């Protein structure tokens, strides 16, 4: 399969990393997925990627119960490394809260789920549907992700 120069410029390569011990994961809704790899294998390879997209879903209660697990420690390490390098962090729902926990939101505005607002201590939680502030792209929840997509696509080109 050959791509024209324009097509190559428009391609966005992606890899899905499971925040788990194995690549085989199941969503809280019961959907089974096989990721490309596990989050532990992304640690130390942050320079190979331009952005992280964190999809929240109902992950936060599970995260809270398992915050001390190696895969969640790796997740926080990856988010911190991407943020400190000024790389793009994209997420919705409570993703902004995790970015805040990772220590990469100082002085930045975030769109977060209303229930996550009180947990934001370094950044500034807003009531906006979505917010782009520097390298942080956040949406209040999944139904508002579309409101930031033009900016996401612009920066990823």
Model-identified regions with their sequence ranges:
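Single conserved hydrophobic/aromatic residue that forms the stacking wall/gate
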Residues: 1-12
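Short internal beta-strands
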Residues: 13-20, 92, 109-113
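N-terminal beta-loop-helix "entrance" segment that forms/cooperates
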Residues: 17-38
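Short amphipathic alpha-helix with an adjacent loop that forms part of the alpha/beta core around
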Residues: 39-48
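Catalytic nucleophile loop
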Residues: 52-56, 75-103, 110
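Glycine/threonine-rich flexible loop motifs
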Residues: 60-73
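A conserved active-site-flanking secondary-structure segment within enzyme catalytic domains
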Residues: 105-126
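Glycine-rich phosphate/pyrophosphate-binding loop and the adjoining helix
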Residues: 121-157
């Amino acid at each position: 399969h050959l791509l024209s120069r324009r097509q190559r410029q428009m391609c966005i390569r992606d890899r899905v990393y499971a925040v788990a011990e194995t690549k085989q994961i199941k969503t809280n809704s019961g959907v089974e997925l096989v990721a490309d790899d596990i989050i532990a294998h992304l640690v130390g390879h942050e320079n190979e990627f331009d952005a992280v997209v964190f999809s929240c879903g109902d992950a936060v209660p599970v995260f809270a119960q398992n915050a001390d697990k190696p895969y969640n420690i790796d997740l926080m390490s990856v988010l911190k490394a991407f943020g400190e390098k000024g790389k793009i962090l994209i997420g919705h729902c409570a993703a902004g809260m995790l970015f805040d926990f990772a220590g990469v939101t100082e002085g930045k505005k975030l769109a977060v789920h209303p229930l996550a607002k009180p947990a934001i201590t370094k950044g500034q939680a807003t009531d906006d549907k979505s917010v782009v502030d520097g390298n942080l792209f956040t949406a209040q929840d999944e139904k508002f992700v579309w409101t930031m997509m033009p900016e996401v696509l612009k920066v990823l080109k």
